[in-house]
C-alpha cells in the first residue's frame, strides 16, 4: 500500500511538469508548485497556481496489472462528485496543469476537421488484454481540453474481433485516445480498428495483433468466461475512489448589452487534492479503502459589483447538500426575441437558459449524450423582454444556488444521498417559458436577503435531463433593461433562501383575468404583478426549469388560455389554466405529470408547506409548484428522489384521459392511457384525470431514474463509456420482487401451452413500486450497441434503460398494473378480438418483450391465449403459446436479431373468440458487454434438474444446473428468465449453497452465469440481519471461492435473487 502511495505521489509530482510542458504553446510555460503533506490516512497535494487568474484542470490516469477499460478518469468540474473503480496495486498518474483560457468563439472542431483515418497502435499487457492508443487528427498541444468541451464529438469507437472474416465485430466506445481491451483469448490473432465518433468518421486500417500465451490456469480459480490465467495476483482488491471537486473558483462572465466584456478572472486560490486512504493504517484491509480526491479551490466568492456573483460550489462531501454550483451569471445581452423557442432543442440542451423571453438560448453542447458531462455551457441568458419596464437587476442567482446548476441541490439533503439521484430528478421541471412578450418578472430568484428588487425576469432554465446532469450552470439572466438594480444579495455561498424573495411571484396570467395566487411561493404572493402576457402562449415550450429554483422564483405560471391546457397540471386558475408548466411540447419532465391535486384550483398550492429555509432548496423548489411537477407534498418526503423521478411524462399531456376501470389506471404504452400513479411513491393525491400520453408523440430520452444506492463500495464497472460513467449510481429502476415466472417460449419444436397467470409484483425486499410512465414510440438511440437500426412501428413502444443496469423483466412489468379477472356469466364465446396489440420493448434487452392489449368490448373474457412465433419458421416450430388472465404478457427468451410475430386470442368457458391482428417485431443485437458470444462447444449447457438447495430465495420456479470449467456446479432457480437465485455445489447430487460476498451484496456473482456485468441483487440486508448458514464466499471477481459460515457475525452478505442481464436457460 505504502509503495503504491509513494508511487502516486512521485508520479503526481513528475507529471505536473509534464502536464504543463506539453500543453502550452511555445514561449513562456509557467510551472506549478505543489505542496505535499502526509497525515495518518491521507496524502494532500496542494497545487499552487502561478497567478490568481489561472484555473487548473487535470485528470487521473491509471496503468497497472488489471486495469479496467475506463482507465481515464477526468476530474469532475464544479464541485461535482464522481466515483471510479480502481485496482489497489496499480500506479496512477495525477496530471494537473493550468487550463488554457476558454475561447468564447471556439466551436467543436469535429465538424470541420478533415476525415482522415486515425493511426492505431496496439501493445500487449497480459495474455488476455491489450492496450490501444491512437492518434489525434488535431494538434493535442492546443486541443488537450477539447474532449471535455465537445462531449458528443470527442468519443471514439473501437472494434475488434478474432481474425476471421466470419466473426462479428465487438464494439466499445471510449472517451479518451487510449483504452484497454480485456477478456481476449491468449495466443490468438485479433483485428483492431478505431474511428472518430462523428458523422463520416473513417475506420482506421485494420491492425492485426496476436495475444501472448497464458500460463497454465490454477485449479479451481474462478475467472471470466475465458479460462486463461491472468498474469495478476489471484486476489486483487479494488478500491473505490470518489473524486470530488470541493470548491472551485467560479468564473464570472459578464456580457454587457451587445459587447462582450472580457471575462473576469476568478480570484486566486489553491486547489487541494486530498488522497484519503482510510485503510492506510489498518493492519488488515478487509473492506477496500476508498481513495478520495477532492480538489478544492479557495472559496472566494466575489460579488461582481452589481452584476454577477460567483458562488463557490460549497460542500465537500459527496452529499453536497447545497452546492450552488457556479452560476456564472451572465448579464443578459438583449437578444432579439423570437417567439419560438426552439423547443426541440431546448429540452435536450442541457443548459438552455431560457431567457424568459421567448428565445431560449440554447447552448450548443446541449445535446448531452447520456451521461455526458454536460459541460456546463454557460447559459447566457438574454434579456427577454425588450420592454424596458423590467429592471434588470441581475438576478443574482447567487443565492439561488444556481439552481440550474445543481439540480442536485434541490433535493433535500437527505435525499441527496446518492448524489446522482437527486440531481437527475429535479432538473426536469421546466422553466416556464413565457411566450412573447410576457414580461415575466420573476422575483429575483431568491435572493436571499433582499426581496428582490424589481422583478427580474430570469428563468434559469436548467435543462434538464441528463442523467447525472453535471450541473449546468445557468446564469440567471437578468433582464437587461436599463437601470440594473443589483440586489444586494448577501453573498453567503449557500442559498439562504431566507426570505425568498418575498415574493413577487408574479404569475403571468395570460388572460390576466384571474391572477393565480402564487404558486406557493412561500412568502406571500407579494404584489402579484401579474403582468399580462399576451395570450399566445402557445409557443412556450420553455425548457425545463430545474426545480431547484428556489421557489420564489416565480412560479410563473402562465395561465394561458385554456387552449393548450396540457395537463391538469395544477391548473389552479379556473380558467383552464394551462399551467405553463406543461408546455405542450416540452413534455416537461413533470414527473409524473400529475401535478398535484388539481382540486386546489383556486388556491395556490400552498399545501406545499413552505419549507423552512433550512429545507434546502429542495423544498423551495418543490414548492414552486411552479413546477408543479414535483408533487407538492413531496417536499416532505425525503424520498423525493423518487418523486422527482424524471420520468418524463409523456410528451404532451392530455388531460382527457379516461381513467381505466381497473383500480389503477392502466398505463398503456399504446395509445393514450393515463400514467398511473403508483401510490407508493407519490404522496400527491392525484386528481381524477391523469395526463395521458399520446401514442405517437416522440419524447426525448428520459434520464434514467435514480435508484436507491446500491452496493457498498462499488458500482458496476464493466461498462465502457465516458470517463466516470462507473460512478453514476446505476440508475436503473429499483427492482421489485420477482414476478411469477412467466413461461416463455421454449426451444422445443412443438407447441407448448403454458399458463402464465401473472401476479402483480409486490414490493418485497425493500423495493418500492414506482410510478413509471416512460413509454416512447421511438428509441432514444436509433441503433443498438452493434449499429443495427432498432425496429420501429406504430405498435411498438420503447422503455429506456440505463446502459449499466442489467435487463429486468420484473421492473418492466411494474408498468402494467394487475387487473382483476373479469367476473360475469358468459352467454357466448367472445365475439370481438382484442385491440391495440402493442409490443413494449426495453432498449438494450433483446431477450424479452411485453405484449399489451385492450380487452374486447362488450365481451366476457376469462383468459387470453398469447401466440408467439419466430418468423420464417414453419407451423409448429419455434412457436409458443402462453395463457394469462391479464391484458399483458411477457414473452421471454427471444433470440437477438430475430423477427417475431405475435397474436392474442380471447377465451371464456364457452369458447374462443377471434384472434387479434398480427404484429411483427425484430429484436435488437445482443449486448456484447453482458456475455461473450461463445463458439460451438464452449456453450454452458443449462440442464433442467431439481437440486437440493437452501430455501433463502425469492425465486420458486424451475431449477437448472450447469457444469463449469472451474470444477463447481452452478445451480439457478428462476423467478423469470432474467431474475434468479444462484447457488454453488461441489457435486451434482449434493447440496447447493448460497454464495456470500465479503464486500458487497453479490453483484459480481453474475460471473457464475457468464455475465461480464456486475448485476443487481436483492434483498440487500446487512449480514447481522441474515441467519448464519454454511455457504461459499469470496470478496472480488477472479478470487477462488471458500467454504464456511456466512451471514450473522461473519460480515459476509448473501441475497435472495440476482439480475445479471443473462437469460437462463437462454434458448427459446
From Swiss-Prot:
Chain intervals for the UniProt region annotation (Disordered): 315-351, 384-811
Decide whether keyword Glycoprotein is in the record.
Answer: yes
What range(s) does the Fibronectin type-III domain occupy? Answer: 116-214, 833-926
GO annotation, biological process: extracellular matrix organization; positive regulation of cell-substrate adhesion
Please list the residue ranges that the record marks as compositionally biased, kind Pro residues.
532-544
Residues carrying covalently attached carbohydrate according to the record: 37
Against PROSITE patterns, the record matches this protein to:
FN3 (PS50853)
User: What does the annotation say about its assembly with partners?
Assistant: Probably interacts with ABI3.
Q: Where is the composition biased (Polar residues)?
A: 340-351, 482-499, 562-574, 802-811
Q: Which protein is depicted?
A: Target of Nesh-SH3
> Which disease does its entry mention?
Defects in ABI3BP has been found in a patient with isolated coloboma, a defect of the eye characterized by the absence of ocular structures due to abnormal morphogenesis of the optic cup and stalk, and the fusion of the fetal fissure (optic fissure). Isolated colobomas may be associated with an abnormally small eye (microphthalmia) or small cornea.
Low complexity bias: where? 326-339, 447-462, 603-631, 737-750
Cellular localisation: Secreted
Q: In which tissues is it expressed?
A: Expressed in brain, heart, lung, liver, pancreas kidney and placenta.
The species is: Homo sapiens (Human)
Q: Which GO terms describe its cellular component?
A: collagen-containing extracellular matrix; extracellular region; extracellular space
Amino acid at each position: 500500500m505504502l509503495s503504491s502511495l509513494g508511487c502516486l505521489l512521485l508520479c503526481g509530482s513528475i507529471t505536473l511538469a509534464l502536464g504543463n510542458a506539453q500543453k502550452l504553446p511555445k514561449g513562456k510555460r509557467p510551472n506549478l508548485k505543489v505542496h505535499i503533506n502526509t497525515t495518518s490516512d491521507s496524502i494532500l497535494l496542494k497545487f499552487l497556481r502561478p497567478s490568481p487568474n489561472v484555473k487548473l484542470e487535470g485528470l487521473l490516469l491509471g496503468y497497472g496489472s488489471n486495469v479496467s477499460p475506463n482507465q481515464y478518469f477526468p476530474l469532475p468540474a464544479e464541485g461535482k462528485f464522481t466515483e471510479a473503480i480502481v485496482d489497489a496495486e496499480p500506479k496512477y498518474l495525477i496530471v494537473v496543469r493550468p487550463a488554457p483560457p476558454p475561447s468564447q468563439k471556439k466551436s467543436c472542431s469535429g465538424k470541420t476537421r478533415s476525415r482522415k483515418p486515425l493511426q492505431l497502435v496496439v501493445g500487449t499487457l497480459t495474455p488476455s488484454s491489450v492496450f490501444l492508443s491512437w492518434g489525434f487528427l488535431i494538434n493535442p498541444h492546443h486541443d488537450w481540453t477539447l474532449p471535455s468541451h465537445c462531449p458528443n464529438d470527442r468519443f471514439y469507437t473501437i472494434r475488434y474481433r478474432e481474425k476471421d472474416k466470419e466473426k462479428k465485430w465487438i464494439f466499445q466506445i471510449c472517451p479518451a485516445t487510449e483504452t484497454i481491451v480485456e477478456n481476449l483469448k491468449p495466443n490468438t490473432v485479433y483485428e483492431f480498428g478505431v474511428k472518430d465518433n462523428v458523422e463520416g468518421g473513417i475506420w482506421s486500417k485494420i491492425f492485426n495483433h496476436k495475444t501472448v500465451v497464458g500460463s497454465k490456469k490454477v485449479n479451481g480459480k474462478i475467472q471470466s468466461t475465458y479460462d486463461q490465467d491472468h498474469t495478476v495476483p489471484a486476489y486483487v482488491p479494488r478500491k473505490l475512489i470518489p473524486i470530488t471537486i470541493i470548491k472551485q473558483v467560479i468564473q464570472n462572465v459578464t456580457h454587457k448589452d451587445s459587447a462582450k466584456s472580457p471575462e473576469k478572472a476568478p480570484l486566486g486560490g489553491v486547489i487541494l487534492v486530498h488522497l484519503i486512504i482510510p485503510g492506510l493504517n489498518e493492519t488488515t484491509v478487509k473492506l477496500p479503502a476508498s481513495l478520495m480526491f477532492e480538489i478544492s479551490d479557495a472559496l472566494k466568492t466575489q460579488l461582481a459589483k452589481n452584476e454577477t456573483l460567483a458562488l463557490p460550489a460549497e460542500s465537500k462531501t459527496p452529499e453536497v447538500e447545497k452546492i450552488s454550483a457556479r452560476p456564472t451569471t451572465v448579464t443578459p445581452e438583449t437578444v432579439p426575441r423570437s417567439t419560438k423557442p426552439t423547443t426541440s432543442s431546448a429540452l435536450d440542451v442541457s443548459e438552455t437558459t431560457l431567457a424568459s423571453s421567448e428565445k431560449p438560448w440554447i447552448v450548443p453542447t446541449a445535446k448531452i449524450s447520456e451521461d455526458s458531462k454536460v459541460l456546463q455551457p454557460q447559459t447566457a441568458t438574454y434579456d427577454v423582454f425588450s420592454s424596458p419596464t423590467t429592471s434588470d437587476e441581475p438576478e443574482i442567482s447567487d443565492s439561488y444556488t444556481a439552481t440550474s446548476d445543481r439540480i442536485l441541490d434541490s433535493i433535500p439533503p437527505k435525499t441527496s444521498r446518492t448524489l446522482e439521484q437527486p440531481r437527475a430528478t429535479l432538473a426536469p421541471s421546466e422553466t416556464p417559458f413565457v411566450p412573447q412578450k410576457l414580461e415575466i418578472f420573476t422575483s429575483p430568484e431568491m435572493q436571499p436577503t433582499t426581496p428582490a428588487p424589481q422583478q427580474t425576469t430570469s428563468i434559469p432554465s436548467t435543462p434538464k435531463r441528463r442523467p447525472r446532469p453535471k450541473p449546468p450552470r445557468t446564469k440567471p439572466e437578468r433582464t437587461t433593461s436599463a437601470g440594473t438594480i443589483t440586489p444586494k444579495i448577501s453573498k453567503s455561498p449557500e442559498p439562504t433562501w431566507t426570505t425568498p424573495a418575498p415574493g413577487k411571484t408574479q404569475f403571468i396570467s395570460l388572460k390576466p383575468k384571474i391572477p393565480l395566487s402564487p404558486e406557493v411561493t412561500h412568502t406571500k404572493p407579494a404584489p402579484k404583478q401579474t403582468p399580462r402576457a399576451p395570450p399566445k402562449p402557445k409557443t412556450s415550450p420553455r425548457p425545463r426549469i430545474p426545480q431547484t429554483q428556489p421557489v420564489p422564483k416565480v412560479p410563473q405560471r402562465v395561465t394561458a388560455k385554456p387552449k393548450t391546457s396540457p395537463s391538469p397540471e395544477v391548473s389552479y386558475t379556473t380558467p383552464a389554466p394551462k399551467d405553463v408548466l406543461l408546455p405542450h411540447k416540452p413534455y416537461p419532465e413533470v414527473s409524473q405529470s400529475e401535478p398535484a391535486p388539481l382540486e386546489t384550483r383556486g388556491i395556490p398550492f400552498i399545501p406545499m408547506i413552505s419549507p423552512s429555509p433550512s429545507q434546502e432548496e429542495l423544498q423551495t423548489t418543490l414548492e414552486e409548484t411552479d413546477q408543479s411537477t414535483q408533487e407538492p407534498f413531496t417536499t416532505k418526503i425525503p424520498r423525493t428522489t423518487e418523486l422527482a423521478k424524471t420520468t418524463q411524462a409523456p410528451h404532451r399531456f392530455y388531460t382527457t384521459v379516461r381513467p381505466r376501470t381497473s383500480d389503477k389506471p392502466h398505463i398503456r404504452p399504446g395509445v393514450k392511457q393515463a400514467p398511473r400513479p403508483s401510490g407508493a411513491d407519490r404522496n400527491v393525491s392525484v386528481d381524477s384525470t391523469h395526463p395521458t400520453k399520446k401514442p405517437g408523440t416522440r419524447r426525448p430520452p428520459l434520464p434514467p431514474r435514480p435508484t436507491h444506492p446500491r452496493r457498498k463500495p462499488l458500482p458496476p464497472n464493466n461498462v465502457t463509456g465516458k470517463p466516470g460513467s462507473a460512478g453514476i449510481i446505476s440508475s436503473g429502476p429499483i427492482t421489485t420482487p420477482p414476478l411469477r415466472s412467466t413461461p416463455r417460449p421454449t426451444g422445443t419444436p412443438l407447441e407448448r401451452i403454458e399458463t402464465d397467470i401473472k401476479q402483480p409484483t409486490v414490493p418485497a425486499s425493500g423495493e418500492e413500486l414506482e410510478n413509471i410512465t416512460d413509454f416512447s414510440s421511438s428509441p432514444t438511440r436509433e441503433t443498438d450497441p452493434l449499429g443495427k437500426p432498432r425496429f420501429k412501428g406504430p405498435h411498438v413502444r420503447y422503455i429506456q434503460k440505463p446502459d449499466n443496469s442489467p435487463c429486468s423483466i420484473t421492473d418492466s412489468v411494474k408498468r402494467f398494473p394487475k387487473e382483476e379477472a373479469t367476473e360475469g356469466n358468459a352467454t357466448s364465446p367472445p365475439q370481438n378480438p382484442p385491440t391495440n396489440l402493442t409490443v413494449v420493448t426495453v432498449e438494450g434487452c433483446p431477450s424479452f418483450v411485453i405484449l399489451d392489449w385492450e380487452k374486447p368490448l362488450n365481451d366476457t373474457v376469462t383468459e387470453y391465449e398469447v401466440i408467439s412465433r419466430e418468423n420464417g419458421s414453419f407451423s409448429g416450430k419455434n412457436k409458443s403459446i402462453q395463457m394469462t388472465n391479464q391484458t399483458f404478457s411477457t414473452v421471454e427468451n427471444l433470440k437477438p436479431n430475430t423477427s417475431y410475430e405475435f397474436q392474442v386470442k380471447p377465451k371464456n368457458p364457452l369458447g374462443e373468440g377471434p384472434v387479434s391482428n398480427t404484429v411483427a417485431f425484430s429484436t435488437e443485437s445482443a449486448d456484447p458487454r453482458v456475455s461473450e458470444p461463445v463458439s460451438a462447444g464452449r456453450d454452458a449447457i443449462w440442464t433442467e434438474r431439481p437440486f437440493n438447495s437452501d430455501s433463502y430465495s425469492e425465486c420458486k420456479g424451475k431449477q437448472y444446473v450447469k457444469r463449469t470449467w472451474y470444477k463447481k456446479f452452478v445451480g439457478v432457480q428462476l423467478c423469470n428468465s432474467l431474475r434468479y437465485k444462484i447457488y454453488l455445489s461441489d457435486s451434482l447430487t449434493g447440496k447447493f449453497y448460497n454464495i456470500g460476498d465479503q464486500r458487497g451484496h453479490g453483484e459480481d456473482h453474475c460471473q457464475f452465469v457468464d455475465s461480464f456485468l456486475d448485476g443487481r441483487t436483492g434483498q440487500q440486508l446487512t449480514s447481522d440481519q441474515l441467519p448464519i448458514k454454511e455457504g461459499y464466499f469470496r470478496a472480488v471477481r477472479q478470487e477462488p471461492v471458500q467454504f464456511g459460515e456466512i451471514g450473522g457475525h461473519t460480515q459476509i452478505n448473501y441475497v435472495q435473487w440476482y439480475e445479471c442481464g443473462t437469460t437462463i436457460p437462454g434458448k427459446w
